[in-house]
């Protein structure tokens, strides 16, 4: 991995993971209970898949299996594609997302807003 890419990963890393842990106190059938919830909505694109995409891309750069200018292609039904769209754009990659044509327009538009090309696939196409 080049020094420039290492610095890019270092700059964006604080926006992924390190999400707060919320402790909720409640009573169930008369007994005190505690519930812990990770606030993954604090991630870059608001979901846990940011961690997955970040780790995959960082490891791919470290191993040399992805280079600047390579295209990222992901098959997804939503959140992973959103994460790859955002991180791919940040790292300077073209991103193509294949997803089912019955997914919400909001997901499609969000990925496109990050610069991804979204290609819809019908049930028949698989």
Label the predicted regions.
Residues 1-126:
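PLP-dependent amino-acid enzyme catalytic core
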């Amino acid at each position: 991995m080049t020094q420039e890419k290492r610095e890019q990963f270092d700059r964006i890393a604080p926006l992924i993971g390190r999400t707060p842990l919320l402790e909720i106190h409640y009573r169930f059938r008369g007994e005190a209970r505690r519930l812990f919830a990770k606030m993954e909505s604090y991630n870059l694109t608001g979901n846990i898949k940011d961690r997955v995409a970040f780790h995959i891309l960082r490891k791919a750069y470290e191993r040399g299996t992805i280079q600047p200018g390579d295209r990222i292609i992901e098959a997804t039904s939503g959140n992973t594609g959103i994460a790859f769209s955002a991180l791919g754009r940040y790292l300077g990659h073209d991103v193509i997302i294949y997803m089912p044509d019955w997914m919400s327009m909001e997901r499609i538009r969000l990925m496109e807003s990050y610069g991804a090309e979204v290609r819809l696939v019908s049930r028949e196409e698989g």
